[in-house]
C-alpha cells in the first residue's frame, strides 16, 4: 500500500467507510497516524476499529488540531454539515487523492496523469494506461476507476499513475499537481452539488490551476466551457479536437468508433506523446484497446441485430455521440432504449441525431417527459422498464439492425447504479439467444 512518513503523528478524521474510506484508514494507521473514523453502518465501524482506528463521528468531536477530515467523494460538501464544522476548526476537508498527492515525495520518481471531464474520462484513463502498458511502461490506474489508490503498491522508478478524477475528487484535492492534466469535455452534470453550471465548470478548471508552470495541460476544445478553461491556462497547453482524428485512422481502432471516441483518442494520443511514446507504440495501443464495460460495449448479437450497452451514458450529452455513431443505412436501423432518472435539459443534446433513430423505447421516470419531447420526431414505445424495452426491441428488429441502450439518464429510479442497469441489459440480451 502507499504510505507516508508525513502522516506519522498526525490525527485525521475519516467520514464514510466504504471501500476507499477503509483503504484510507488502513494507509493512515500504517503510516503512524491517529485516526478517528465513522460510518452509519455498524459493520463498517467494526472493520475500521479492526484496522486500528478509534470510532467517533467527526461532527460530534472537537476537530481543532486535526490534520484533515477525509471524506468520500459522495459526501455533498455544499449540504453536509461536516464542511462548516471543519471550517470552524480550520481543518481542511480532503479525499484520498489528496493523501496520495502528499505522499508523492516519498515515492520512486514517477509521473501523474489526471483525466477529468463530464464524459469520456474513464475511457481516456483506460486508453492512456493501456497504451503505456503496451509500450512497457509501469502503470497504475486509479482514482475514480479501479481500486482505491492508497491500497496499491507504489510503482517502480519511471512509472506513471493514471488517475480518473471526478469533479468531487478535484474539490477534495489541494496539492495534486499532475504532470499531465487532461480535460475531455464539459456539459451540465451534478448541478445539485454546485452553485449552478458555473460552479461545476470552476471545479473542473481547478485541476489546471493546481499544476506547476512546467507541467502540461491537454484540453479538448470542442465545447465552449472547455475553450474558456483553455484560454485561462498560463502554462504549457495542448489544445486538441475530435476533428484532429482522420476517419481512415480511426477505422483501424475497433473499440474506438464514433465521434465521441475520436475525442477520447485524441486526448489519449496527446498525453502519451507528452510522456514520450512514439507513433508506432501509440498506434499499437489504439488498435489493441478493448472497450470498458457499459461504454458502447457490444454485448452480443440476437435476432440478427447487434446489441450495445452504453449504460454509462447518464446524460444527454454522453448519449448523443452514441446516436451519432450509427447513421441510418438500408440494412441498418437504430433502436434506442432511453430513460431513467433525467438530468438537466432533457434530450436537447441528442436532437441533431434523432434522424438516426428508427424507434425509441422509453423507460423509468423520464418516460413521460421524454415521450413528450421526442414524440414528434421519433416513433416511440412507452416500455416502462428495461426488460419490456428489450422484449419490444427484440420483436421489432430485422437482421443488420442495432439496439442501443444509451439512457441519457441516471439509473437510480430503477437500479442501484449504471453498472447494475448495464448488467441487467446484458442478461436480458443473453436470454434472447442468438
From Swiss-Prot:
Name the Enzyme Commission number(s) assigned to this protein.
Answer: 6.3.2.9
**What catalytic reaction does the record list?**
UDP-N-acetyl-alpha-D-muramoyl-L-alanine + D-glutamate + ATP = UDP-N-acetyl-alpha-D-muramoyl-L-alanyl-D-glutamate + ADP + phosphate + H(+)
The primary location reported for this protein is cytoplasm
Q: Give the record's keywords alphabetically.
A: ATP-binding, Cell cycle, Cell division, Cell shape, Cell wall biogenesis/degradation, Cytoplasm, Ligase, Nucleotide-binding, Peptidoglycan synthesis
Q: Name one Pfam family in it.
A: Mur_ligase_C
Metabolic or biological pathway, per its Swiss-Prot or TrEMBL entry: Cell wall biogenesis; peptidoglycan biosynthesis
> What is its subcellular localisation?
Cytoplasm
List the Gene Ontology MF annotations in alphabetical order.
Answer: ATP binding; tetrahydrofolylpolyglutamate synthase activity; UDP-N-acetylmuramoylalanine-D-glutamate ligase activity
**Which residues are involved in binding ATP?**
117-123
Cellular component per GO?
cytoplasm
Q: Which domain of life is it from?
A: Bacteria
Look up the record and give one Gene Ontology term from the biological process aspect: regulation of cell shape
Regarding protein family, the annotation reads: Belongs to the MurCDEF family.
The job of this chain, per UniProt, is described as: Cell wall formation. Catalyzes the addition of glutamate to the nucleotide precursor UDP-N-acetylmuramoyl-L-alanine (UMA).
User: What NCBIfam families does the database record attribute to this sequence?
Assistant: murD (TIGR01087)
- Which PANTHER family does this one have? UDP-N-ACETYLMURAMOYLALANINE--D-GLUTAMATE LIGASE
Q: What is this protein called?
A: UDP-N-acetylmuramoylalanine--D-glutamate ligase
Organism for this UniProt entry: Sphingopyxis alaskensis (strain DSM 13593 / LMG 18877 / RB2256)
